[in-house]
């Protein structure tokens, strides 16, 4: 994933010295105490790792692949990438999957979450041209994983859209719903006999606002509070359309599960004043709930607070309709319940308070939400300036999901720590251990968490940060001819947890 979070949040996150919070002790230690009766993960709990196609595959113009939005963006705007790099070669996983497989086997993971490149398999976005070489490649990957008792978990869209679709406005045009429907049908038909876990979209909240609101990701549209909301609306409908397709056409004989990966922090207040819990709930609904509430909530629509605020603000701005229209009865029926599991990408947390007056452009998500987000300067920070070690947040967001969404089954689809790429990565081990402890605590408290995926298997291209921030359990020698993968100390630690099913 990863660097994307900062692009949304850097505009309105402040630092604060919150040294006497009722939630956290002072100090920067990255740890969490064990709670509950069980000290081991259940036998049916699955451990894995994640990657994404554009970030690791390389081979950007080989074997019939079409251009993606990220190919075009990095080639036309190298100055927007911190080290002027791109994903043209990346880890060369398209040609070096055997090296990735060696790492997966060393880790003894139960599953591998990877994404299929839409422009690689369908260069023109629809099914008129199907790239057989790409199909053969992904068939090879899936078959080799299964031969080694590693379950494939496939993400359909991890931010690399066929460039062809940007001509129509990308996710601002509802035609993308139909295109994604065809793409999903193709994937289910081609790979669904072996792939039983599907993630339609990865972190739509995180790509919609930077790409269509703040103009810092392709296609660099600056229309906050309008185009980014269209993106999120069309993504939600595309997801639900694909889900209903699977249930109607494939589910009975393929027996798979379909869900979405939603990113979120957990939010806290540093006060016990009346109304503080409302602020926490508001922050959660304006981020996580934007997608989770329509799918897993009772209403089958966006959170009421979000609908009410944006409608009111739109009227104040002189508009005849809301910038975020509630889902129609037709779409509400399709969207509600369109998830067999909930994918959660969690990295860090924030403190939240109401911003008076509201901040941000008019219109914008920042202005509509009226939230001011803060971090505690005593928290341990990663290489990424948005990433702090707050394991309690993972435990608490899992409990929040349990209570809000009828204890839906949760797959933790991403969770990770960045540094400069050092092999002796003690901080990553601390982060990993404390967050796995949070998962175990949540399981002990009745949360239905069944999968955990660390981000990432190997160091990779981190979007606008290039290769300046590394999340991998394996170091990637980007400049070498063979793109060697070298195990960091954290890889050994993670393997020990997987083998023993307990935290050491």
Give residue ranges: language-model regions.
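Ordered, helix-dominated protein-protein interaction surfaces in large eukaryotic regulatory proteins
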Residues: 1-3, 140
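Active-site region of glycoside hydrolase catalytic domains
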Residues: 18-81, 105-106, 124-126, 132-504
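A common structural microfeature
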Residues: 44-46, 94, 111
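Acidic/polar N-terminal loop/beta-strand segments that form early-domain functional surfaces
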Residues: 50-52, 115-119
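Short, well-structured secondary-structure segments
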Residues: 110-117, 151-155
């Amino acid at each position: 994933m990863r660097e994307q979070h900062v692009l949304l949040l850097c505009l309105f996150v402040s630092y604060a010295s919150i040294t006497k919070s009722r939630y956290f002790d002072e100090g920067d230690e990255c740890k969490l105490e064990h709670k509950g009766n069980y000290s081991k993960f259940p036998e049916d709990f699955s451990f894995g790792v994640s990657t994404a196609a554009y970030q690791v595959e390389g081979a950007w113009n080989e074997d019939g692949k079409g251009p993606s939005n990220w190919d075009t963006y990095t080639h036309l705007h190298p100055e927007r990438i911190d080290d002027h790099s791109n994903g043209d070669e990346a880890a060369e996983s398209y040609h070096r999957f055997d090296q990735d497989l060696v790492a997966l086997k060393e880790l003894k993971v139960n599953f591998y979450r990877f994404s299929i490149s839409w422009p690689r398999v369908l260069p023109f976005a629809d099914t008129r041209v199907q790239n057989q070489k790409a199909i053969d490649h992904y068939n090879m990957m899936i078959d080799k994983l299964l031969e080694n008792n590693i379950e494939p978990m496939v993400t359909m869209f991890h931010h690399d859209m066929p460039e062809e679709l940007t001509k129509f406005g990308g996710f601002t045009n509802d035609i993308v719903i139909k295109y994604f429907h065809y793409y999903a049908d193709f994937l289910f038909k081609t790979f669904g006999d072996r792939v039983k876990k599907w993630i339609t979209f990865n972190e739509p909240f995180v790509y919609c606002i930077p790409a269509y609101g703040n103009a810092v990701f392709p296609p660099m549209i600056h229309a906050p509070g309008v185009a980014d909301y269209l993106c999120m609306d069309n993504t939600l409908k595309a997801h639900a359309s694909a889900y209903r397709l699977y249930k109607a056409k494939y589910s009975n004989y393929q027996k798979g599960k379909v869900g979405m990966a939603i990113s979120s922090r957990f939010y806290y207040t540093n006060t016990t004043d009346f109304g503080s819990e409302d602020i926490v709930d508001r922050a959660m609904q304006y981020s996580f709930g934007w997608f989770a509430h329509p799918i897993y909530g009772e209403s089958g629509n966006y959170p009421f607070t979000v609908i009410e605020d944006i409608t009111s603000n739109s009227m104040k701005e002189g508009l005849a309709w809301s910038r975020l229209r509630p889902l129609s009865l037709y779409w509400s029926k399709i969207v509600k319940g369109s998830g067999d599991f909930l994918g959660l990408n969690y990295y860090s947390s924030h403190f939240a308070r109401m911003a008076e007056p509201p901040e941000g452009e008019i219109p914008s998500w920042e202005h509509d939400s009226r939230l001011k987000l803060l971090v505690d300067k005593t928290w341990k920070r990663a290489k990424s300036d948005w990433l702090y070690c707050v394991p309690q947040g993972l435990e608490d967001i899992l409990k929040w999901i349990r209570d809000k969404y009828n204890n839906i089954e949760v797959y933790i689809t991403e969770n990770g720590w960045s540094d400069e790429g050092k092999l002796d990565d003690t901080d990553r081990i601390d982060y990993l251990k404390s967050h796995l402890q949070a998962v175990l605590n949540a399981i002990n408290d009745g949360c239905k968490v069944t999968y955990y995926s660390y981000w990432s298997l190997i160091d990779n291209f981190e979007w606008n940060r290039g290769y300046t921030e590394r999340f991998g359990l394996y170091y990637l020698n980007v400049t070498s001819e063979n793109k060697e993968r070298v195990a960091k100390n954290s890889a050994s630690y993670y393997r020990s947890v997987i083998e023993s099913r307990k935290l050491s």
